[in-house]
Amino acid sequence: MLQALVKRFAVKFLNDPSFQDLTDGLAAKDGEKAFRAAHTLKGVCLNLGFTSLYKVSAELTEVLRGRETEGSDELYEQVKEQYTILTEAIQELAAQS
């Protein structure tokens, strides 16, 4: 039963808009949007125990805290990499009955 609950919440993460909002905010150089999205992503990852993505999103949140996007590229790439790894693993989990 606990496994089913964990799986349910993990799969719901796939529909969370935070990563896309972060991507859009950075592309538009919208520091406020990027910060809010990074902060939300960080919190969701902390709550769900997604440690690797939490760590890099927390670092990115701090870089964006001043609402400036300059200097965020390298950390964003790390967030993107961890997000891809995590979402692929969740998709595999979701495919299992």
Features from the language model and the residues they span:
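Long amphipathic alpha-helical segments
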Residues: 57, 92-97
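Conserved catalytic segment of histidine kinase HATPase_c domains, centered on the N-box/ATP-lid region
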Residues: 66-70
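Long, amphipathic alpha-helical coiled-coil segments characteristic
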Residues: 1-40, 71-94
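Short, well-ordered alpha-helical segments
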Residues: 18, 30-37, 45-65
